């Protein structure tokens, strides 16, 4: 399934993109795609819904972030070898783990607010992984059973604040609007091999980034 949220900011409705491309309002079945509902039980429930009995939403309406109020927004730095080369860095031997504030989450097509005195605003297309159940101290193989689905994430950064001003990365990563997510949360069953996906980030009409995961 492709899940999305449609409507004005803070008033989005949860929806499903049907196989024939219609955006179906499922707000009568689920309140929102928030931590209370981002689980495998909810996905199973949604898969059994008769979409033909539910109202259609206009495709011209604003698309919000495909999830809202996640408990954590964890990211990995220098995750692509091409990006590491662009920055003059070697791929790290251990993952660089950092946090983005959940308050920076934004719709995929919403404006990005340029911070005051910003000189080095930057963007990175990333694959977001949505976790569907709690886990601690599990193996890499076991981790696959906890993935609910995938989404696109734009990891927006102010590089001067992030790197040149020293300290933790969060200050250059978490300004309001620095976390566009979506448009869709695609359930894991729809993607047989996430490593084969291609992702693109468009800046105006130019390809700002084009990455393959493998």
Regions found by a protein language model. Give the residues of each.
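Short stretches within intrinsically disordered, low-complexity N-terminal or propeptide regions
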Residues: 17, 130, 210-211
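Glycine-enriched loop-and-adjacent helix/strand subsegments that border the catalytic/binding cleft
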Residues: 70-206
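Single conserved hydrophobic/aromatic residue that forms the stacking wall/gate
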Residues: 204, 208-214
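N-terminal non-catalytic cap/leader segment that marks the start of a structured domain
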Residues: 1-95, 192
């Amino acid at each position: 399934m492709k899940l999305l949220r449609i409507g004005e900011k803070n008033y989005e409705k949860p929806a499903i993109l049907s196989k024939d491309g219609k955006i179906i309002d499922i707000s009568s079945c689920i309140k929102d795609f928030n931590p209370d509902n981002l689980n495998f039980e909810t996905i199973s429930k949604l898969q059994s819904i008769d979409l033909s009995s539910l109202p259609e939403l206009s495709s011209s309406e604003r698309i919000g972030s495909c999830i809202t109020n996640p408990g954590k927004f964890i990211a990995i730095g220098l995750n692509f070898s091409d990006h590491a080369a662009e920055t003059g860095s070697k791929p790290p031997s251990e993952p660089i783990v950092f946090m983005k504030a959940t308050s920076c989450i934004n719709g995929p097509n919403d404006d990005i607010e340029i911070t005051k005195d910003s000189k080095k605003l930057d963007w990175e297309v990333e694959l977001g992984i949505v976790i569907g159940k709690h886990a601690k101290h599990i193996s890499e193989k076991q981790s696959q059973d906890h993935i609910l689905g995938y989404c696109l994430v734009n990891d927006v950064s102010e590089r001067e604040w992030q790197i040149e001003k020293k300290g933790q990365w969060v200050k250059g990563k978490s300004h309001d609007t620095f976390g566009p997510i979506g448009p869709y949360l695609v359930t894991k069953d729809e993607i047989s091999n996430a490593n084969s996906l291609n992702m693109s980030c468009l800046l105006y009409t130019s390809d700002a980034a084009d990455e393959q995961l493998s």
